[in-house]
């Protein structure tokens, strides 16, 4: 089996959420077996709301992104977590 890059969009609870603090919390809960690829990027959505885009390298086995999705969803200040792209590397 190989590895895949998974692009994950994390929506904060509100425009008032401190994205710098949220980025640090996200980095702190990346599960074993997943590695952060590059920086966590801010993506403008609308009306001042920005999503965080996280790219992780994970094993391509079934459910490879689930531990990360579950960990990110439990972080205080996170409204929603969605895998937007997965590709083999």
UniProtKB/Swiss-Prot annotation:
Keywords for this protein: Elongation factor, Protein biosynthesis
Any single Pfam family the record assigns to this protein: EF1_GNE
Source domain of life: Archaea
InterPro entries: eEF-1beta-like_sf, EF1B_bsu/dsu_GNE, Transl_elong_EF1B/ribsomal_bS6, Transl_elong_EF1B_B_arc
Molecular functions per Gene Ontology: translation elongation factor activity
Family listed: Belongs to the EF-1-beta/EF-1-delta family.
Protein's job: Promotes the exchange of GDP for GTP in EF-1-alpha/GDP, thus allowing the regeneration of EF-1-alpha/GTP that could then be used to form the ternary complex EF-1-alpha/GTP/AAtRNA.
Protein name as annotated: Elongation factor 1-beta
Protein species of origin: Methanosarcina barkeri (strain Fusaro / DSM 804)
